[in-house]
Amino acid sequence: GYITNFGKAHLEGFGGVEGVIKGKSELYDHLIADKKFIFFNADDPIQLKKLSSYPGKFGYSSLDTKNYKIDLLGAHPFVKLETEEAIISTQLIGSYNFTNCAAAVLIGKYFNIPMEDIKNAIEAYVPQNNRSQIIDKKEYYIVLDAYNANPNSMEAALEHFNNLPGNAKVVFLGDMFELGEKAIEEHQNIVDLVSGMNFDKVYLVGQNFTKTRSNFTKFATFEELSGFLKNNKLKKGKLLIKGSRGMALERILDYL
């Protein structure tokens, strides 16, 4: 078994981050009870602590030489990583995708898949379904990451987009769902983060974002946004589109 991370997702159902950690850790509890094998990120202190005394594990790390070493070489914009045997250049944007790639390498290694095959498979993968997609559309360079969103993934996407070279950057952010009583607080945290970044325009879409304190342009519904886009052509440049599945912000592409 493998757990990717313990983040701020599904807070409504789990009652907070501690509930997320407890719920996801039940996978570890089950595997340990049955003496099964666990793959893990040895650079994650939560995973490392929970598995410290369990022998049936195989981890990757950029720091700890007791585990299989995998380093992030860069994400400008695509993730490039170095294993003990190869350098892998992916078609996945953002350093936040490094752990996904590293886990794929680790599991492949455990099952004795040749590194050349692991490298070729990861390098050939092109993201689809609104997940970390790069789209060149007319005069726009678009980062489409509208499959889903939570505070951690939204923060990571924004930091990556902010660090891309060039100017004329426009951001569309849709509501994050399943945050329960933390919804407005977490949306305000995102707005505060964006306020310190260098974007030409920021458009917020959804009931939660409209309740935040900011000077950004807000739309309570997608229909309000689409009406705006019909009458206001965006300048040539880079666009980030990020939101939860229920917001379906990929529809923005129809108005460009």
Residue ranges of predicted features:
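Short glycine-rich anion-binding loops that position phosphate/pyrophosphate groups of nucleotides
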Residues: 7-9, 43-45, 148-149, 176-177, ...
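Glycine/threonine-rich flexible loop motifs
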Residues: 12-18, 154, 180-185, 250-251
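Amphipathic, non-transmembrane alpha-helical secondary structure
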Residues: 25, 29, 155-162, 188, ...
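Active-site beta-alpha connecting loops in nucleotide-dependent enzymes
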Residues: 127-130, 146-215
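ATP-dependent carboxylate/acyl-activation modules
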Residues: 129-131, 246, 250-251
